[in-house]
Amino acid sequence: MNALLTNPFKERLRKGEVQIGLWLSSTTAYMAEIAATSGYDWLLIDGEHAPNTIQDLYHQLQAVAPYASQPVIRPVEGSKPLIKQVLDIGAQTLLIPMVDTADQARQVVSATRYPPYGERGVGASVARAARWGRIENYMAQVNDSLCLLVQVESKTALDNLDEILDVEGIDGVFIGPADLSASLGYPDNAGHPEVQRIIETSIRRIRAAGKAAGFLAVAPDMAQQCLAWGANFVAVGVDTMLYSDALDQRLAMFKSGKNGPRIKGSY
């Protein structure tokens, strides 16, 4: 199979294009495929807080493959064995949580690259990513098609942001608002003025360094604000939250005493 590996999500980030995404936490291929038909530019399949197994992630990648929406996988952490598994099932774009230092970022980059550029284990003949060994020169071309995003979501990470941005192989940095606000002393309050100031400053620093800047905003006004600050890959909702809101709204139409969606915290 003479196939040229491409990653439209990465190419659009390189061009500075704005991409609007949706967080998938429902853990099913059925729900993932429904989301893929909606037209979002990218879909974050969450393995950190949602109870997704490797096989769950695999099935969701299969479900969205026929559609234009580009999948992004967030594993529970950035260990070398887990990254290897996620890449082998066909993920081309990864979002690695809780990256606090440049050394951590370099380790993650190494885990995504085959030798001599990194430490990714070789097993193309059993990997969906290589179409079970049928993609010619897979190892030679895969590095260019991988997109690696890291999450900055603590005070320590903010202190090290410039060094993280200097790491070769990092394509973008995602601001994690919930963990960041907690780390700064404002738990469940990403809207606090000090947190907002830091988010704005961080987004501008990321873009000034030539990297893509990402954010998850469950409130539309916050999403618009982040886009105005320069963020160019922004998730504007979480499927489970949207689902629960829709259920509440429908119930409120028919049962007295129900006032629609409950007020929820940040993610």
From Swiss-Prot:
Catalyzed reactions per annotation: 2-dehydro-3-deoxy-L-rhamnonate = (S)-lactaldehyde + pyruvate
Entry keyword annotation includes Magnesium: yes
Residue numbers binding substrate: 151, 178-179
Residue numbers marked as site, Increases basicity of active site His: 88
Molecular function GO labels: 2-keto-3-deoxy-L-rhamnonate aldolase activity; magnesium ion binding
Any one GO CC term of the record: cytoplasm
Enzyme class: lyase
Record note on cofactor: Binds 1 Mg(2+) ion per subunit.
Pfam family, one: HpcH_HpaI
Active site residues of this protein: 49 (proton acceptor)
Lyase keyword on record: yes
Gene3D superfamilies the UniProt entry points to: Phosphoenolpyruvate-binding domains (3.20.20.60)
Site note Transition state stabilizer, residues: 74
Keywords in alphabetical order: Lyase, Magnesium, Metal-binding
Binding positions for Mg(2+) per the UniProt entry: 153, 179
Similarity field: Belongs to the HpcH/HpaI aldolase family. KDR aldolase subfamily.
Annotated function: Catalyzes the reversible retro-aldol cleavage of 2-keto-3-deoxy-L-rhamnonate (KDR) to pyruvate and lactaldehyde.
Matches recorded under HAMAP family: KDR_aldolase (MF_01290)
Descriptive protein name: 2-keto-3-deoxy-L-rhamnonate aldolase
Gene that this sequence comes from: rhmA
